[in-house]
């Protein structure tokens, strides 16, 4: 997925799209049914509070990044509409699950806060409208899993 336009973030901010190198803002993604079976088993570990979950595995190669953006949760919103899901009393959330210990050059920032000491299995919750970015300035691929669904506010605070 090419992320240079950051889902319209630059346009919403009223600024020009930065002049990034063309091949820098790319992330490899595997969605839902194309993910290996173990990915869906991981999702099961969150089903006591994450409802209607869908999964994505991301691979960010060295020298690549995902510029500041706000998640639109497009695939999740499509699923809710298509399957007429009852999400009353819940908010959309994205769980960013780290599939490896942090390595040199692996970077995540959410609302101006960086997380530099995560371990494999740690996760963070990305709420709607939170500006965040990731980068791989290291020498090995960076792997994460996204679990996107709906949760009750009291379950994620």
Predicted regions, residues:
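Non-heme Fe(II)/2-oxoglutarate
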Residues: 1-57, 65
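Extracellular structured ligand-interaction cores
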Residues: 52-55, 63-65, 92-96, 131, ...
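Conserved short histidine dyad/triad with adjacent acidic residue
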Residues: 57-90
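Short, flexible loop/turn elements at secondary-structure junctions
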Residues: 59-61, 72, 97-103, 128-130, ...
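A short secondary-structure junction signal
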Residues: 67-71, 78-80, 106-112, 136-137, ...
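A short beta-strand-loop-beta hairpin characteristic of the jelly-roll/cupin
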Residues: 90-119
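A short hydrophobic beta-strand segment most commonly corresponding to one strand
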Residues: 93-98, 123-125, 139-156
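Conserved metal-binding segment of the jelly-roll/cupin
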Residues: 116-132
């Amino acid at each position: 997925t090419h992320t240079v336009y950051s889902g319209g973030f630059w346009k919403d901010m009223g600024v020009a799209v930065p002049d990034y190198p063309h091949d820098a803002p790319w992330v490899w993604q595997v969605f839902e049914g194309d993910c290996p079976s173990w990915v869906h088993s991981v999702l099961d570990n969150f089903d006591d509070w994450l409802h209607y979950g869908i999964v994505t595995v991301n691979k960010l190669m060295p020298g690549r990044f995902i510029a500041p953006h706000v998640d639109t949760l497009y695939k999740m919103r499509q699923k809710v509409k298509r399957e007429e899901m009852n999400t009353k009393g819940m908010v959309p959330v994205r769980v960013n699950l780290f599939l490896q210990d942090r390595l040199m050059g692996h970077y995540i920032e959410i609302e101006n806060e960086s997380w530099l000491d995560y371990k494999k299995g740690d996760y963070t919750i990305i709420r709607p409208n939170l500006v965040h970015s990731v980068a791989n300035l290291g020498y090995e691929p960076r792997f994460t899993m996204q679990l996107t669904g709906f949760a009750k506010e009291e379950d994620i605070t």
